[in-house]
Amino acid sequence: YAIAGRPRF
């Protein structure tokens, strides 16, 4: 999922 402009799994 994407959070605060940083894509993370």
Swiss-Prot record:
Q: Which UniProt keywords apply?
A: Amidation, Neuropeptide, Secreted
Gene Ontology cellular-component terms listed: extracellular region
Q: Where, per UniProt, does this protein localize?
A: Secreted
Summarize tissue expression.
Answer: Limited to neuronal cell bodies, neuronal processes and sinus gland.
Signal peptide region = none
Q: Name one GO biological process term.
A: neuropeptide signaling pathway
The keyword GTP-binding appears for this protein: no
Q: Record keywords: Secreted included?
A: yes
User: Where this protein primarily resides, as one coarse class?
Assistant: secreted
**Phenylalanine amide, modified sites:** F9
| The family this protein is said to belong to | Belongs to the NPY family.
Q: What does this protein do?
A: May act as a neurotransmitter, neuromodulator or neurohormone.
- The protein in question is named Peptide tyrosine phenylalanine 3
Query: What taxonomic classification does the UniProt entry list for its organism?
Result: Eukaryota, Metazoa, Ecdysozoa, Arthropoda, Crustacea
